[in-house]
Amino acid sequence: MSQHIRAGVSKIEITCKEEGTYDDCLSEKAKKHIPAEYLSTKLIVDDPLFARVLVLDDGSEKVVWITMDVTAIGARTISQNILSDSADNFMPDLRKQIEKEFNIPGCNVCVSASHTHQAPRLLCDDAAQINRILEAIKSALQNMAPVVIGVGSGYENTITVNRTIMMKNGTDHTLSPFPPENEIEGLRPIDPEIGILRIDRLDGNPFAVVYNFASHLLLGSPQGNSGHITADHVGVTLKYLENNLGGETIAFFLQGAGGDINEIFGTDSNNRRRTVDFGTKLGQSILKGYQKIITGPVKIRMVVKNIAFPFRTDIPNYITALKQEQAALTASLNTAYAHLLSFKEFLPLYLKYALNPDYPSHLSFRYLRAAECGDNSIKEEDDRNRLEIKKYLDRIKTMEQMTRNELKISMLKKHQEVIDEIGTPTIPAEIQGVKIGECVFITAPMEILTEVGFDVKKMSPFKHTYIASISNGYLHYAPPASYYRRGGYEVTECLLAPAWEDIFYNVVKNIFDELKK
């Protein structure tokens, strides 16, 4: 066996070149989940999408890791064709071809999605995706070179936020509209760690770099556009790294435990540089960590476990409870015979009482003179107006809650339809453990949440451990079991029963045990 591991890298464009609108590329089943006003949006490519290939071979183990600028892998059926880019049979078909053409075991192939999702169609057609990836693998294998590898961490805590808002009533909130500030308990944490794999040629020149970070790719294109085909901020960071490291360096991104993590710039809709700012800031933080990493010879090991996760069975009861709440909220709006302000009446009244709470209706001398005379008419007028303002605001709050509930009902119905269509109580999943020196990546076909990512790191006997989410398939969100009763977005947008978590931790522990041997 050679003293040094050998590596090969390559990348190839896989961007959709079709013209048309969202309406042209969405199935009828998918369209019912998309607001009608979006269907006329044109497909526009703002920046290219790539498949990137990293091959590692230490003489006894060979691993092929493919990263793709796409929302998810093999997600058509499970998303009702909303995430239509990657066919259900993409993974088995690709692995079969890799085994046939390159004699590399399919189980040693990992495909990870970046999770960019600005447009409903991102990639070239199914056959072209596989053919181009095979071409990229061939190129990587033809350019294998001895390398040294090091692993380390970067730190970036200023550009992401956990989007789950914990409420004082024990629930979780994510969906718009935003809740009243006085009802908020706090935010869940982020993981600021950036996992960094540094791969150098034997002469010390950069060969490749891999970074792992939790984010959600919701910013849009570097040009400042939303809804266009784009690699989002990941494309900016990868380009930044490649330009700064120079030569023929290829950079790779692996999605972390980012299921509940958003970019903090996501609400800055007027900042057209937000994607560039995010990607550049993250790239700078990666390079800070990269410079501290010491490289050397390493060995690689891979462990693959095939398991089954149970589907949730509580959706019908969940929908029933939400509909009962909707009925009660609707009944609360029945204010027959009561005086109700129109918006035209409400807005000027609200502004008056917000701008000058002490003297809203008249100049202050009128209030002072009324007090001297014992005249309560102005106070009574203010009390009536404040009551009308409160009634109007209460109705808005009620309708906001009804909007959230309708969104939840819609999502839950969609997932129940998927579960019914699949027709089995469980769904298969593949979990991989890839050990590169003292670094271990745990892959998962779900959008893993931050708390689960923290737990995996705590469980690990290895110095550096990272989650590579949305790999080798797609099973939507995977929240901790304790979150289900809190009813947050990731729980609502979830197919899996709470028991998935213990199953996952058990298989991860088994992987760690095998990798230690």
Go through each PLM region and give its residues:
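Non-catalytic substrate/cofactor recognition surfaces at enzyme active-site rims
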Residues: 1-517
